[in-house]
Amino acid sequence: MTEADIAVKSSPRDYKKLTRLYCMNGGFHLQILADGTVAGAADENTYSILRIKATSPGVVVIEGSETGLYLSMNEHGKLYASSLVTDESYFLEKMEENHYNTYQSQKYGENWYVGIKKNGKMKRGPRTHIGQKAIFFLPRQVEQEED
């Protein structure tokens, strides 16, 4: 194996592993609650544990591990949790230059991103754009106990 081989090979994320999405804006974790609400959590909790599943290259669905509900964005840009994966549940995952990830609605558009405001409430898709701290998330792997 040469140095060039090492430089271009990256280890793919294990999508069976559990993750928290830590927002650059205010330090909140994305959480999916049992009632279908999506919000930011200041502290780590069971509702902020997520499973990010790739459906095709660069496209993911985000499932709340505790609730089994899927993150979705409606036609008004409001984030909600759905019991079924619909066309509103697919997000384009991209690692940005700052090494944070963004999650852009595949259905609704060029500049509709998942985002958390400074107060922990979710930001509507049409009010987001690249460069805002609200849309940058750092995936943090959750340590799982061995069975």
Swiss-Prot record:
Binding-site list for heparin: 25
Heparin-binding: region residues: 117-133
Pfam families associated with the record: FGF
GO BP field: angiogenesis; branch elongation involved in ureteric bud branching; fibroblast growth factor receptor signaling pathway; hemopoiesis; mesonephric epithelium development; neurogenesis; positive regulation of angiogenesis; positive regulation of cell division
Cellular component GO terms, alphabetical: cell cortex; cytoplasm; cytosol; extracellular region; extracellular space; nucleus
SUPFAM superfamilies: Cytokine
Keywords carried by this UniProt record: Angiogenesis, Cytoplasm, Developmental protein, Differentiation, Growth factor, Heparin-binding, Mitogen, Nucleus, Secreted
SMART domains: FGF
GO MF terms, alphabetically ordered: fibroblast growth factor receptor binding; growth factor activity; heparin binding; integrin binding; S100 protein binding
Signal sequence, start to end: none
Domain of life (superkingdom): Eukaryota
Subcellular location per the Swiss-Prot or TrEMBL entry: Secreted; Cytoplasm; Cytoplasm, Cell cortex; Cytoplasm, Cytosol
Keyword Secreted: yes
CDD domains: beta-trefoil_FGF1-like
Keyword Nucleus recorded: yes
Main location: secreted
Biological function: Plays an important role in the regulation of cell survival, cell division, angiogenesis, cell differentiation and cell migration. Functions as a potent mitogen in vitro. Acts as a ligand for FGFR1 and integrins. Binds to FGFR1 in the presence of heparin leading to FGFR1 dimerization and activation via sequential autophosphorylation on tyrosine residues which act as docking sites for interacting proteins, leading to the activation of several signaling cascades. Binds to integrins.
Similarity comment: Belongs to the heparin-binding growth factors family.
Name of this protein: Putative fibroblast growth factor 1
Organism name: Danio rerio
